[in-house]
Amino acid sequence: MKKFIQDFKAFALKGNVVDMAVGVIIGGAFGKIVTSLVNDIMMPPISLLTGGVNFTDLKLVLSKAVVEGGEVVKPEVSWNYGNFIQTTVDFLILAFVIFLMIKAIMAAKRKEEEAPAAPAPTPPEIELLTEIRDLLKKQ
């Protein structure tokens, strides 16, 4: 049991696992931001352009609800394709933003790799020896 706990600790504290956990947490929060962007910022103008259609309300009713005495006896059965449209827009925006972020990271890495390393400064001893050599050549 002790070995199992040690193995788990080694696994859980590896850099990649911790990085992945942080990524999942940030990704979840970022997903909420994108959902809000789509629902609250992008879809209202689209709804305005389409004559006030709210995409989340779009559905195809397969069987209507049965109401008797003000009480629903049989609930409505519907195919809610509007939610699918909304979720697809969310996904496309999220995928596009992640694509842009990865492109930016890759470009920064490429730039870092392409930048030549500055030459190391010549030690003073070498400079002195070079000067002595040059003076001896002149004589």
Swiss-Prot record:
Which InterPro entries does this chain map to?
A: Mechanosensitive_channel_CS (IPR019823), MS_channel (IPR001185), MSC/AndL (IPR037673), MscL_channel (IPR036019)
Keyword 4Fe-4S attributed:
no
Among SUPFAM superfamilies, the record links this protein to:
Gated mechanosensitive channel (SSF81330)
Q: Say if the entry is tagged with keyword Cell membrane.
A: yes
Gene Ontology molecular functions: mechanosensitive monoatomic ion channel activity
The cellular component terms of Gene Ontology attached to this UniProt record, alphabetical and capped at eight, are:
plasma membrane
Query: Where does it localize?
Result: Cell inner membrane
Keywords, alphabetical: Cell inner membrane, Cell membrane, Ion channel, Ion transport, Membrane, Transmembrane, Transmembrane helix, Transport
The main location is membrane
Pfam families associated with the record: MscL
Which residue ranges does UniProt annotate as crossing the membrane? 17-37, 88-108
Q: How does it sit in the membrane?
A: Multi-pass membrane protein
Instruction: Kindly state the subunit structure of this protein.
Output: Homopentamer.
- Give the protein family: Belongs to the MscL family.
The free-text function statement in the UniProt record for this protein reads: Channel that opens in response to stretch forces in the membrane lipid bilayer. May participate in the regulation of osmotic pressure changes within the cell.
Q: What is this protein called?
A: Large-conductance mechanosensitive channel
Identify the coding gene: mscL
